[in-house]
């Protein structure tokens, strides 16, 4: 913190910070994590303390109330929506309020280092039942990723982005192996559909940073079931509505 001026820390698999079992309610584990955070905050008040916890929701609420941010995995729901399949595509768990949390400390993400890429899933398994809207087509895949970006970034709370997500990286996580080095695809910037996704991602992030309507102190209402999803933001400065049709 003092030497490198970092903004905070992300701690890996903190459910394992215990001598007992990893699940359930563990007061000792919570006290250990809170002691670590309190020490960090004594040097830098407000430093980000992010946990990859994967614990019981009640324990995650307790940690969130203490000031932690915690990862929330909704990748598979975003993948199914992008591919054009609605059975497992609800984004409701991407919103902290749906989990009964008081604080907007749920860090959700559309892609991560542990999950398959959406563009790859679209290319390999996307809904191709409608020839005029074949999800496996790169241009159509990128437009559908614009929708996942819209919801993935504007749902209230902090977000995590993975490298080249904004350009629709479509090489499998298992090519050639899960932890193998993946080639950078700088040429994606010259591909028109990918470049459009890049620009749209920037616009959406700018909206979130520039307008209080998309901040933590807005009234947020959402229907994120089924193919057609919508969000409504109500704030004294401006109201906003976002709608996405994930159907094919």
List PLM regions with ranges.
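Conserved interdomain hinge at the start of the Helicase C-terminal
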Residues: 145-147
């Amino acid at each position: 913190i003092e030497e490198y001026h970092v903004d905070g820390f992300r701690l890996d698999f903190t459910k394992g910070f215990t001598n007992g079992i990893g699940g359930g309610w563990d007061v000792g584990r919570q006290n250990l994590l809170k002691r670590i955070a309190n020490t960090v905050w004594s040097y830098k008040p407000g430093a980000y303390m992010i946990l990859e916890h994967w614990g019981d929701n009640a324990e995650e609420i307790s940690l969130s109330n203490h000031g932690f941010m915690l990862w929330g995995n909704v990748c598979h729901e975003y993948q199914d929506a992008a591919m054009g399949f609605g059975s497992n595509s609800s984004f409701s768990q991407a919103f902290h309020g749906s989990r009964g949390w008081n604080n907007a400390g749920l860090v959700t993400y559309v892609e991560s280092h542990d999950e398959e890429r959406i563009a790859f899933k679209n290319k390999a398994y996307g809904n191709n039942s409608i020839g005029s809207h074949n999800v496996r087509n790169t241009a159509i895949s990128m437009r559908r990723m614009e929708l996942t970006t819209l919801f993935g970034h504007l749902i209230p709370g902090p977000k995590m982005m993975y490298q080249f997500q904004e350009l629709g990286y479509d090489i499998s996580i298992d090519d050639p192996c899960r932890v193998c080095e993946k080639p950078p695809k700088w040429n994606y910037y010259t591909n028109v559909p990918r470049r459009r996704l890049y620009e749209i991602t920037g616009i959406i992030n700018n909206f979130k940073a520039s307008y209080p309507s998309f901040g933590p102190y807005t009234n947020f209402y959402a229907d994120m079931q089924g193919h057609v999803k919508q969000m409504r933001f109500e704030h004294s400065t401006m109201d906003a509505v976002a709608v996405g049709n994930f159907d094919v």
